[in-house]
């Protein structure tokens, strides 16, 4: 069992991986008892983005706050609080903050997707 608060989770800078103005916090994963998946909280600063990329695992996203776009398989999808998305394995995608405040979203991946 595990209960935690986002304010107590360290922020990990994602810019060394090619992102701009991006950080993640690992909320729940194997260390908390969820063996097969990891729930991360991603934050994109104003004008921040993830790199255009793909990988061999899917992920599920839920937007907590802010606005942006998800470019997936050549199509642009608007993001706002309450938006959910499923990104299949091996599909090119990129998250971009287009708003005037941070874009925060949950990203759930299999454990092999958390590096």
Give residue spans per PLM region.
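A short, N-terminal "cap"/entry segment at the start of jelly-roll beta-barrel domains
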Residues: 1-36
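Conserved short histidine dyad/triad with adjacent acidic residue
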Residues: 25, 40-55, 89
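Short, conserved beta-strand element in jelly-roll/cupin
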Residues: 41-45, 55-70
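Histidine-centered metal-chelating micro-motifs
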Residues: 49-51, 69, 85, 89-95
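Structural motif
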Residues: 67-69, 76, 92, 102
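Short acidic-glycine-tyrosine-enriched beta hairpin
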Residues: 75-89
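Ligand-binding loop in jelly-roll beta-barrel domains
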Residues: 89-114
């Amino acid at each position: 069992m595990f209960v935690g608060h986002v304010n107590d989770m360290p922020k990990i800078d994602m810019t060394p991986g090619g992102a701009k103005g991006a950080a993640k916090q690992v909320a729940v994963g194997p260390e908390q008892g969820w063996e097969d998946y990891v729930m991360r909280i991603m934050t994109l600063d104003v004008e921040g983005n993830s790199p255009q990329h793909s990988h061999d695992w899917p992920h599920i996203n839920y937007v907590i706050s802010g606005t942006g776009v998800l470019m997936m398989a050549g199509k642009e999808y608007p993001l706002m609080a309450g938006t959910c998305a499923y990104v299949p394995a091996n599909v090119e995608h990129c998250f971009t903050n287009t708003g005037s405040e941070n874009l925060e979203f949950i990203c759930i991946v299999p454990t092999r997707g958390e590096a």
